[in-house]
Swiss-Prot record:
pH profile of the protein: Optimum pH is 4.8.
Temperature-related properties: Thermostable. Retains full activity after 20 minutes at 90 degrees Celsius and 75 % of its initial activity after 20 minutes at 100 degrees Celsius.
Pfam family of the protein (one): 1-cysPrx_C
Organism: Pyrococcus horikoshii (strain ATCC 700860 / DSM 12428 / JCM 9974 / NBRC 100139 / OT-3)
Induction profile: Up-regulated by exposure to oxygen (at protein level).
UniProt name for this protein: Peroxiredoxin
Chief localisation class: cytoplasm
Length: 216
């Protein structure tokens, strides 16, 4: 089982787009990726999730992020299900879906709940260096909110690029709106710097350890 901050394991996987190597397939293109598992093909909740992801896929791609699905079904099942979605819901799934029919990758990543034989609804956000930046789990009976995952990815990329933190419900936080949090001072000197920045109007603070500013 892996955790946030670790390197994504190097694996070769069979997908609806052919055999690919992770994380190299995406990182060598300078891209982040979202690996998400679903319990099974031809199931209602999973179908709504794939429909929802495809409807938002260009928003993820504008951020330099590619989705890739996974379940323990075989590749022919994925292909027929994708065809069904296209024929019946008028949406063409254009991202790869891993056929982890032996469950080896799912087991390695901790995607299979205790006592189960199919995956939970796991989400792994992996950056362009192959580092796992976020892991989210939903139970089989509850579908994911891709808008929240999109918010998570946007926030992670901003945090990485700007060295800031993002508050609850950003960019619609109840206290500071769409502003971002300046990391708390960790030394006396940094505390002085925060106070000086506040005096200059460069940042706002509730206290020296709780400062925020507009996103530049």
């Amino acid at each position: 089982m892996v955790v946030i901050g670790e390197k994504f394991p190097e694996v070769e996987v069979k997908t609806t787009h052919g055999v690919i190597k992770l994380p190299d397939y995406f990182t060598k293109q300078g891209k982040w990726f979202i690996l998400f598992s679903h319990p099974a093909d031809f199931t209602p909740v999973c179908t709504t999730e794939f429909y929802g992801m495809q409807k938002r896929v260009e928003e993820f791609r504008k951020l330099g992020v590619e989705p890739i699905g996974l379940s323990v079904d075989q590749v022919f099942s994925h292909i027929k299900w994708i065809e069904w979605i296209k024929d019946n819901l008028s949406v063409e799934i254009d991202f790869p879906v891993i056929a982890d029919d032996r469950g080896e990758l799912a087991e390695k990543l901790g995607m299979i709940p205790s006592g189960a034989t199919i995956t939970a609804r796991a989400v792994f956000v992996v950056d362009d260096k192959g580092i796992i930046r976020a892991i989210v789990y939903y139970p089989a009976e509850v579908g994911r909110d891709w808008d929240e995952i999109l918010r998570l990815v946007k926030a992670l990329k901003i945090s990485t690029e700007k060295g800031v933190a993002l508050p609850h419900k950003w960019p619609n936080n109840e206290l500071i709106g769409d502003k971002v949090i300046v990391p708390p001072a960790s030394t006396i000197e940094e505390k002085k710097q925060r106070e000086e920045a506040k005096a200059k109007g460069e940042i706002e603070c509730y206290d020296w350890w709780f400062c925020y500013k507009k996103l530049e």
